[in-house]
């Protein structure tokens, strides 16, 4: 692989593309995240058995469809999410989604570090701040090696978390006296179904919007759709189930407390640590690509800086986790909606990244994101879905009208350059 093995400033060449199996493990390493188990615990204690599965399957199906669109575009073009955003937002306009997406990934990194350090501190009596510092440093170091390191870590962590989660579910069901007893559990504090759906989608809408950053390494765009669906519909659903079963059986929403109560302290520390490590490295990798789009600096250097920032802010982010998900569920989806909408309208432009003429700032795209956020906040229904559709539809309607002359001029120039 070349020195810039992150390919942060241009398309991934065919020589650096990877097979579907390697990408599937990388994406499962992303979605097999303990945060989904924590959210699953919240749903498991707040929803009935039937409503839990309905919320998880609907929410992750929506996530799978959304990320499949973005994965297809990423694999077809070989471009990062942030370079794709230049087509719709403009070269400097793309700095806004890069800042928003890159910043949230730094936040997720901090949440992940705390999710590992706090239960280990509870169980061992070691200082939590020291654990945060050490684990944050170790997780930051490996991201320097790029997509290859993510693949190796995922090959280890994905089977391990599947085994641990499956065993925890088996203990929970047996401890209750069978599946029928688990089905009969009535939530002490019921959770609104629309809120539950927003939590499911919000749990991975930020990382899901960055699907292109990982799947762009795929050799086949159609298979990239399969990779995204497996990772988000199947992988993320399993993580919710792993978290919910023990939570419902023991009445504890915190997965670390559940694992300790089930006598799984040591394997939980090792396996959940690996699990968080893979997702956190994915988060830092993606954040580096985002800030590289803004600064032009090496994405590897920026990933290390972001790791330090996320480590310092870890405890604050962990303590505001539900609020963080609520923010993400409305603020991030319109960005992906705009990228998808522009590709559907102008897909031929994406074939010539190096020569395509782009606006400096496309204010229509920024307005569409604002309208998408408003749709998510004010319209009834599922917040992230309203936000995606609001952003995409606003862009599809407004961009051809407000940028009619600019779009026509750019199309004319590009047609002549191709000829």
Curated annotation (Swiss-Prot):
Residues 1-19, 72-100, 148-152, 213-221, 278-300, 342-358, 401-419 are cytoplasmic. Residues 40-51, 121-127, 173-192, 243-257, 321, 379-380 are periplasmic. The chain crosses the membrane at residues 20-39, 52-71, 101-120, 128-147, 153-172, 193-212, 222-242, 258-277, 301-320, 322-341, 359-378, 381-400. GO terms for molecular function: cytosine transmembrane transporter activity. Required for cytosine transport into the cell. It comes from Escherichia coli O157:H7. Its main location: membrane. It is found in: Cell inner membrane. One of its GO terms (cellular component) is plasma membrane. InterPro entries: CodB, Pur-cyt_permease. It comes from the Bacteria. Belongs to the purine-cytosine permease (2.A.39) family. Keywords: Cell inner membrane, Cell membrane, Cytosine metabolism, Membrane, Transmembrane, Transmembrane helix, Transport. One of its GO terms (biological process) is cytosine metabolic process. CDD domains: SLC-NCS1sbd_CobB-like. It is a multi-pass membrane protein. This is Cytosine permease.
């Amino acid at each position: 692989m070349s020195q810039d093995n992150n390919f942060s400033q241009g398309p991934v060449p065919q020589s650096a593309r990877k097979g579907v199996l390697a990408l599937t493990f990388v994406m499962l390493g992303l979605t097999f995240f303990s945060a989904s188990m924590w959210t699953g615990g919240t749903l498991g204690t707040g929803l009935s058995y039937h409503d839990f599965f309905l919320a998880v399957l609907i929410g992750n199906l929506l996530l799978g469809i959304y990320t499949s669109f973005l994965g297809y575009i990423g694999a077809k073009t070989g471009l990062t999410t942030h370079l794709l955003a230049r087509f719709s937002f403009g070269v400097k306009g793309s700095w806004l989604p890069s800042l928003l997406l890159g910043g949230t990934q730094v936040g997720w990194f901090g949440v992940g570090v705390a999710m590992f350090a706090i239960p280990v501190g509870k169980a061992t009596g070691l200082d939590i701040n020291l654990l945060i510092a050490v684990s944050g440093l170790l997780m930051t170091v490996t991201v320097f090696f790029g997509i290859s390191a993510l693949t190796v870590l995922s090959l280890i962590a994905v089977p391990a978390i599947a085994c641990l989660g499956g065993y925890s579910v088996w203990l929970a069901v047996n401890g209750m006296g069978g599946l029928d007893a688990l089905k009969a559990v009535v939530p002490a504090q019921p959770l609104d179904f629309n809120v539950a759906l927003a939590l499911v989608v919000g749990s991975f809408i930020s990382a899901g919007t960055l699907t292109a950053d990982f799947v762009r390494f795929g050799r086949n765009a159609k298979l990239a759709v399969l990779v995204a669906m497996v990772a988000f519909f199947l992988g993320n659903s399993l993580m919710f189930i792993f978290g919910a079963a023990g939570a419902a059986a023991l009445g504890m929403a915190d997965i670390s407390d559940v694992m300790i109560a089930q006598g799984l302290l040591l394997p939980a520390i090792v396996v959940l640590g690996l699990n968080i490590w893979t997702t956190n490295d994915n988060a830092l990798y993606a954040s580096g690509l985002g800030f590289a789009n803004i600064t032009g600096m090496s994405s590897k250097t920026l990933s290390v800086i972001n790791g330090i920032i996320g480590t310092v802010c870890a405890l604050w982010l962990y303590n505001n986790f539900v609020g963080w998900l609520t923010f993400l569920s409305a603020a991030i989806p319109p960005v992906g909606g705009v990228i998808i909408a522009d590709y559907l309208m102008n897909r031929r432009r994406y074939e010539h990244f190096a020569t395509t003429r782009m606006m400096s700032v496309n204010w229509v795209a920024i307005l569409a994101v604002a309208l998408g956020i408003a749709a998510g906040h004010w319209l009834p229904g599922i917040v992230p879905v309203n936000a995606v559709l609001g952003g995409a539809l606003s862009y599809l309607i407004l961009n051809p009208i407000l940028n009619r002359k600019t779009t026509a001029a750019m199309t004319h120039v590009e047609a002549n350059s191709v000829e």
